Amino acid sequence: MPQLNPTPWFPIMMLSWLIFSLIIQPKLLLFTPTNPPSNKTTTTTRSNPWTWPWT
């Protein structure tokens, strides 16, 4: 049963972190969102109270 042999666990873990750090992470850091956030002025909307015709 190969999953019980702990010898290759550390090299496999280090290889996966190396792949993540050198290949995947730079691609994610270069991503620019299509709609960058902008400063918008907040407008307060005035709400009218409901009228209850049956009371």
From Swiss-Prot:
Subcellular location field: Mitochondrion membrane
Domain of life: Eukaryota
Major localization class: mitochondrion
Membrane protein topology class: Single-pass membrane protein
Keyword set includes Ion transport: yes
Biased composition (Low complexity): 37-55
GO molecular function annotations of the record: proton transmembrane transporter activity
Region of interest called Disordered, as start-end residue ranges on this chain: 35-55
Gene Ontology CC terms, in alphabetical order: mitochondrial membrane; proton-transporting ATP synthase complex
Membrane spanning residue stretches: 10-30
Keywords noted in UniProt: ATP synthesis, CF(0), Hydrogen ion transport, Ion transport, Membrane, Mitochondrion, Transmembrane, Transmembrane helix, Transport
GO biological process terms, semicolon-separated: proton motive force-driven ATP synthesis
PANTHER family: ATP SYNTHASE PROTEIN 8
Role, per record: Subunit 8, of the mitochondrial membrane ATP synthase complex (F(1)F(0) ATP synthase or Complex V) that produces ATP from ADP in the presence of a proton gradient across the membrane which is generated by electron transport complexes of the respiratory chain. ATP synthase complex consist of a soluble F(1) head domain - the catalytic core - and a membrane F(1) domain - the membrane proton channel. These two domains are linked by a central stalk rotating inside the F(1) region and a stationary peripheral stalk.
The family this protein is said to belong to: Belongs to the ATPase protein 8 family.
Subunit structure, interactors included: Component of the ATP synthase complex composed at least of ATP5F1A/subunit alpha, ATP5F1B/subunit beta, ATP5MC1/subunit c (homooctomer), MT-ATP6/subunit a, MT-ATP8/subunit 8, ATP5ME/subunit e, ATP5MF/subunit f, ATP5MG/subunit g, ATP5MK/subunit k, ATP5MJ/subunit j, ATP5F1C/subunit gamma, ATP5F1D/subunit delta, ATP5F1E/subunit epsilon, ATP5PF/subunit F6, ATP5PB/subunit b, ATP5PD/subunit d, ATP5PO/subunit OSCP.
Protein name, as recorded: ATP synthase F(0) complex subunit 8
Organism field: Opisthocomus hoazin
Protein encoded by which gene: MT-ATP8
